[in-house]
């Protein structure tokens, strides 16, 4: 059963799942796909080739799927937004469609919790179980790993990669890549420590201990981070530690470290 308010605009061609609720003055475009049990609240807009997974909620005046804020974009076809199941997108968020400079899609995984006034720009790749606090701003092509958390009022520079289970503190400004399982803070943000709160929520005690040992080895003051990562990658059998090392070895924007580190 669909519950569509008489003042809502749902264009012909939109694919609407079961038990969908579309409130007053909301808009859903002809190319949109809404999964089952989706709620589009008052005044929200779902535009263009946008897919929203089951059990997701788009709150009032959020705009999902509008064209990118990119001066090189010229109405390319086959671009859009894909959002996984159980997403919560709060008031006044903006999520832009992808461009042909990426694969054409802005992607957000399952169980995303995106608070009011956040912005996700074109071609971002967002993992599962992420949290963006109020006014977090992701520029184009940013990648967030699973379980990443971005604090309020924090901008992230285009093409930056944030690893899984990272925490970027509120009111920071991030312009380089953050190693999985780490916490970064400051303007400009640099890595301060492991994200112990986050990893203790996800992993067993023994796994946490391996990450603590790896962090101490990698971030030893005065030693090259990439040299340490290369050495540890060959020595360890721990999957999470290998992820940390691989990330460091493959970064293109560099890792933000305290002054005096390389």
UniProtKB/Swiss-Prot annotation:
What is the predominant subcellular site recorded for this chain? Answer: cytoplasm
Please state where this protein is localized.
Answer: Cytoplasm
The Gene Ontology biological process annotation of the record reads: lipid A biosynthetic process
Q: By its UniProt entry, which CDD domains does this protein fall under?
A: LbH_UDP-GlcNAc_AT
Q: Which GO terms describe its cellular component?
A: cytoplasm; membrane
The pathway where this protein functions is: Glycolipid biosynthesis; lipid IV(A) biosynthesis; lipid IV(A) from (3R)-3-hydroxytetradecanoyl-[acyl-carrier-protein] and UDP-N-acetyl-alpha-D-glucosamine: step 1/6
**Which InterPro entries does this one have?**
Acetyltransf_C, Acetyltransf_C_sf, Hexapep, Hexapep_transf_CS, Lipid_A_LpxA, Trimer_LpxA-like_sf
Q: Which reaction does it catalyse?
A: a (3R)-hydroxyacyl-[ACP] + UDP-N-acetyl-alpha-D-glucosamine = a UDP-3-O-[(3R)-3-hydroxyacyl]-N-acetyl-alpha-D-glucosamine + holo-[ACP]
GO molecular function term, any single one? acyl-[acyl-carrier-protein]-UDP-N-acetylglucosamine O-acyltransferase activity
The record ties this protein, via SUPFAM superfamilies, to: Trimeric LpxA-like enzymes
Query: What EC number(s) are associated with this protein in UniProt?
Result: 2.3.1.129
Q: What start-end ranges are recorded for coiled-coil regions in this protein?
A: none
Q: What keywords are assigned to this protein?
A: Acyltransferase, Cytoplasm, Lipid A biosynthesis, Lipid biosynthesis, Lipid metabolism, Repeat, Transferase
- Tell me the protein family, please: Belongs to the transferase hexapeptide repeat family. LpxA subfamily.
What does this protein's UniProt record list under function? Involved in the biosynthesis of lipid A, a phosphorylated glycolipid that anchors the lipopolysaccharide to the outer membrane of the cell.
Q: How does it assemble?
A: Homotrimer.
Q: What is this protein called?
A: Acyl-[acyl-carrier-protein]--UDP-N-acetylglucosamine O-acyltransferase
Which species is this record about?
Campylobacter curvus (strain 525.92)
- Source lineage: Bacteria, Pseudomonadati, Campylobacterota, Epsilonproteobacteria, Campylobacterales
């Amino acid at each position: 059963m669909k519950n569509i308010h008489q003042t809502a605009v749902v264009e012909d061609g939109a694919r609407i799942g079961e038990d969908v609720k579309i409130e007053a003055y909301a808009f859903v475009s002809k190319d949109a796909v809404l999964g089952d049990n989706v709620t589009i609240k008052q005044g929200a807009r779902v535009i263009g080739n946008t897919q929203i997974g089951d059990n997701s909620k788009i709150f009032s005046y959020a705009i999902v799927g509008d064209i990118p804020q990119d001066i090189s974009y010229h109405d390319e076809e086959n671009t859009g937004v894909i959002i996984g199941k159980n997403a919560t997108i709060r008031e006044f968020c903006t999520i832009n469609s992808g461009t042909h400079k990426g694969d054409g899609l802005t992607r957000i995984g399952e169980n995303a919790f995106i608070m009011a006034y956040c912005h996700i720009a074109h071609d971002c790749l967002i993992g599962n179980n992420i949290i963006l606090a109020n006014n977090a701003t992701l520029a184009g092509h940013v990648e967030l790993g699973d379980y990443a958390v971005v604090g309020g009022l924090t901008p992230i520079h285009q093409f930056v990669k944030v690893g899984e289970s990272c925490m970027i503190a509120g009111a920071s400004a991030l312009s380089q890549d953050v190693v999985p399982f780490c916490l970064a803070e400051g303007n400009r943000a640099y890595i301060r420590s492991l994200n112990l709160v986050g990893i203790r929520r996800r992993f067993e005690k023994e796994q946490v201990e391996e990450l603590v040992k790896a962090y101490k080895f990698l971030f030893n003051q005065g030693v090259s981070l990439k040299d340490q990562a290369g050495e540890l990658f060959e020595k360890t059998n721990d999957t999470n530690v290998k992820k940390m090392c691989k990330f460091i070895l493959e970064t293109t924007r560099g890792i933000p470290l305290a002054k005096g580190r390389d």
